[in-house]
Every structure is written in structure tokens, then in C-alpha cells.
Amino acid sequence: MNKAIEEKEASSNTYPFGKGGFKIDKLTEETEKRYLRKEEFELIKNSPQENFILERARRLFLFSYYCFGMSFVDVAHLTQGNIKLLESGEYIVYKRSKTQNSKAAKPIKIPITDTIKDLLDWFKQNTPLTGDYLLPVVTKKYFGEQLYDHIRTRYKRINNDLKKLGRILGIKNLTTYVSRHTMAMMLQGQEVPREIISQVMGHTDLATTNTYLDSFETNVTDKVAQLL
């Protein structure tokens, strides 16, 4: 994108990660960070939908969760080129779009478990995939500003689909971002060290992870207080 701006093929005013630009994580700022209780997540996991649109949204949610809470924009950009055969097996390897230009950013390596492979196979067999994209988020061969606008539209649409799914299952405000929050809290609940959680989330420093997880603590203590 920087090169495109330099060559005047794109405008710096709409640079996706610059001031005033496209920030998919904040397209629709959530007033409250939400994560699912274990039983709510299990309900989503075990509730396949006959409606294809809702089933696609459900599986995208699960894919994000099992890929260490991968953000929607990174899910959207995954291609065959992100699948790498390493010594210990196949991995999805990528850098977060949000921090890829940071010197501290490192590639995230996600082992392709049987669950992830099953999800990828389902998308390949049941949805039209564009070009080399792994998932049915980007549906047209767009580039530059058109691509970011397209992802913005798809982000809103899939979140609407998830909210419909949530209403069916009795889960409020289900969105793609909830999968990331849920993954982080599930790991913390299993006493995974925050250093590891920080690494799999692609945070460039532990302070970001601490702030991120600490933001949930009030919600947790509030719920505990209601039990007394």
C-alpha cells in the first residue's frame, strides 16, 4: 500500500492504517468488550445451522477462535501463500495487519489442527473462493482502496449474520471480535501464562496483553459478586 501511494495509485488520505484510515478492528466500536462463557461457546460449536448464511458465519467465528482469535481483517487476507510446511507440520503463518509495520511484530504461526483443517475443507467444498483466498470473505478480485472498502462491507454483513445466529441461540451481541476476546479469556481461565497469550495474539508487548485482559476483570468480579 505504501508503494501504491508513492506511485500515486492510491491516496494517502485513505491509507488503511494511517490517520483517519481503515481500521477494521474499530469499524464498529463496541461499547463493551464481550467474551463467551464456556457453555455459550460450546453451544455455538455444537449448533450447525440449516441456513447456509448462518452456518458460514458460525464457521468463520469458529475459525477465528481456533486460530488464536485471529482478527477479521487477517482472516479476510489469508491466502494459500500463508500455509507453510515446517518441520513439525503445516502451519498458517502471517503477520497481523494492525502491527505488521512495527519493528517488534513477529510472524504468528498457527498449527493446522484437525479442527482447523476440517473448517478449511468445509469452506473449500461449500463456498465459492476467490483466487487464492482461503476463506469466503473477499468475494471479488479487488485491490487497494476497493479491497478495503469491500472488506469493510463484508465485516458488517458477517457481523449481522452472527447477531442473527446469536438471537437464535440466545447469545447477545455476537460478533467476530467476540471470538478473539473469548479465546483470550479461555486461555487465561486455563492458567496459560500471559506471555504465551500475548505471543499467540500477536501483541507487540506484554503491556498490551495485560491491558487487554485486565479490561475483563471488572466484568468477572461483577458476575462473581452477583453470586453472593
Question: What residue ranges belong to the model's regions?
Answer:
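Basic, Lys/Arg- and aromatic-enriched nucleic-acid-binding interface segment
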Residues: Y15-E30, R34-F72, A76
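Catalytic-site neighborhood detector that most strongly recognizes the C-terminal catalytic loop/helix
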Residues: L27, Y35, K98-Q100, M201-Q226
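Short, contiguous acidic/charged loop-to-helix segments that flank catalytic cores in large enzymes
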Residues: Q49-N51, S97-P111, E145-R154, K172-T175
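Conserved tyrosine-mediated DNA breakage-rejoining catalytic core shared by Y-recombinases
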Residues: H77-D121
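Short, basic (Lys/Arg/His-rich) helix/loop patches that form interaction surfaces
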Residues: H150, N159-Q199
